């Protein structure tokens, strides 16, 4: 919110509204701060490639997840872990509204914030004046379906990045679109056996190369850093930019201190929706991801795959996939980007239908767009917030 306030300082939004943000339970400066791993444990986690999908390899990966879950339980306790989650955060939002003495809120939610906004308007529909949800999460999707669609979205973004990179003969992925994924694997797969060179003594692990790549795919503004990091791998030289991208995603500062964002994210998602525990279901998901997101897939399909961390979570879920409740007429607008890697476009289409809200479509390759400089989107959002002028379905 601090960054948004600066970018909106000359906007009608700043003239008409106070900007209020909050850290949900366990996140950021909220207390107690949810922390499951020490900084050293986070570094060690990132050194694990976790790509051996043989039965023994899967068992070893799942043991790492079990250890994570146990550390969360030991350090935070079951009552607190059970109290985090979107359902609780929506109630906390209403407590903030009441504390501010406001009858209604005007809400802008990005990415996970769309899930939080959907939960709020479901519980407190009369307390919403205007709500804009950008980068939507479809509340009807189960975790496996959502994971496959998200990975497919990152493949689309990777293809866009590679096509842009491939316009230059110096592109580390080459210039042949049919070879982009193969060339990528030739650069990153050797990191499973040996980290790549960086000025940081940690080196670049395979996991960090993947994480750094994924982070760069959120916005074209990061593509140049991805290219720089991949060029470093190609030359056997310095891959610092890929490590910096991974550190940015993981919330690690230059002194080696981590934010608690990733631990909190995992704790929240694990209580928000039931996670299948059948190993066969996860093997099927692995097969689907290999088909739809080949740049993320190491080695060959084995018929085995590790279950997600949430399959071992020590507290029960507090919600389940279900359609969003229709929003009061004229109170909500959904924004979705055609090639959003993290929250695929179709999720926005589906959420808008469930809320019976208009949809603003932005044609682009990035994660979220409101107040990122697109006049078509921003003008419609400002008119909606300030004057409650509800846009029709709009294409920008």
Language-model segments: residues:
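Conserved alpha/beta-hydrolase "acid-adjacent" motif
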Residues: 341-346
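Catalytic active-site module of serine/aspartate enzymes centered on a nucleophile-bearing elbow/loop
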Residues: 363-396
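Short beta-strand/loop motif that positions the catalytic acidic residue
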Residues: 328, 333-336
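Alpha/beta-hydrolase fold active-site neighborhood
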Residues: 181-329, 357, 373, 379
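A catalytic-pocket lid/entrance helix-loop region that shapes and gates access to the active site
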Residues: 35-49, 119-183, 228-254
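Conserved acidic catalytic loop of the alpha/beta-hydrolase fold
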Residues: 75, 79, 90-105
């Amino acid at each position: 919110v601090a960054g948004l306030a600066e970018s909106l300082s000359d906007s009608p939004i700043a003239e008409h509204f106070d900007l209020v943000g909050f850290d949900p339970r366990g996140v950021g400066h909220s207390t107690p701060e949810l922390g499951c791993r020490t900084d050293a444990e986070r570094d060690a986690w990132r050194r694990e490639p976790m790509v051996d999908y043989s039965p023994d390899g899967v068992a070893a990966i799942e043991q790492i997840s079990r250890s994570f879950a146990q550390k969360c339980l030991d350090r935070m306790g079951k009552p607190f872990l059970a109290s985090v989650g979107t359902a609780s955060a929506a109630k906390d939002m209403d407590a903030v509204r009441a504390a501010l003495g406001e009858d209604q809120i005007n809400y802008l939610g990005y990415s996970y914030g769309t899930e939080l906004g959907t939960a709020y308007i479901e519980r407190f529909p009369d307390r919403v004046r205007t709500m804009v949800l950008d980068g939507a999460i479809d509340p009807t999707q189960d975790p496996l379906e959502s994971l496959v669609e998200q990975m497919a979205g990152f493949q689309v973004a990777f293809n866009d990045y590679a096509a842009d990179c491939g316009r230059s003969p110096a592109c580390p992925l080459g210039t042949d679109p049919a070879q982009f994924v193969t060339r990528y694997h030739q650069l990153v797969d050797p990191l499973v056996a040996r980290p790549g060179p960086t000025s940081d003594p940690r080196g670049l692990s395979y996991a960090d190369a993947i994480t750094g790549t994924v982070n760069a795919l959120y916005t074209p503004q990061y593509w140049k850093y991805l290219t720089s990091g991949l060029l470093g791998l190609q030359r056997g030289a310095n891959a610092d930019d890929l490590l910096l991208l991974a550190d940015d995603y993981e919330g690690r500062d230059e002194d080696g201190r981590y934010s608690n964002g990733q631990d909190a994210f995992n704790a929240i998602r694990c209580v928000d929706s039931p996670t299948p525990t059948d190993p066969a279901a996860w093997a099927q998901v692995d097969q689907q991801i290999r088909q739809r997101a080949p740049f993320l897939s190491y080695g060959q399909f084995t018929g085995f795959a590790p279950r997600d961390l949430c399959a071992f979570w020590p507290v029960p879920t507090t919600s389940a996939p279900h359609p969003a409740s229709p929003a009061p007429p004229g109170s909500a607008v959904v924004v979705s980007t055609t090639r959003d890697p993290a929250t695929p476009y179709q999720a926005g289409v589906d959420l808008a239908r469930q809320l019976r809200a208009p949809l603003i479509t932005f044609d682009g390759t990035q994660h979220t767009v409101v107040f990122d400089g697109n006049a078509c989107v921003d003008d419609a959002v400002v008119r909606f917030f300030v004057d409650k002028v509800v846009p029709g379905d709009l294409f920008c």
